[in-house]
């Protein structure tokens, strides 16, 4: 049975009782940079980790966010969540990752600490960058 877990340096794998490390591929590095960009509210990190055909789907937005509009969306997101009491401290849990056919797909439950804001996210990354994210909100 093969188990994988994302980490800051690579992903771990285990087959039977043997454990090892494999260097991260570009898509793992880009996914890590993308989430760091959100944690740090760093537009440069976000843009540099996305592909040219990037699309972000947030049901609170009137239309999908593309790569060019991502920095403005990040500012709107920060203002909107701070009005709810958030300080951009995230709690991600129940993460599931799949690396298949050159696409890293990551699902997680997210919560903004200090608020009732929570939901699910799916993020898809290729070796040219994060190309898709969709978030949902739950009450």
Give a label for each model feature:
Residues 32-36, 48-63:
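Short, solvent-exposed secondary-structure junction/capping segments
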Residues 23-42, 49, 73:
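Short, aromatic-enriched amphipathic alpha-helices that serve as compact interaction elements
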Residues 38, 42, 54, 78-81:
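Short amphipathic alpha-helical segments enriched in hydrophobics
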Residues 2-6, 11-22, 61, 71-139:
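A beta-strand edge to alpha-helix "cap/lid" segment located at domain peripheries
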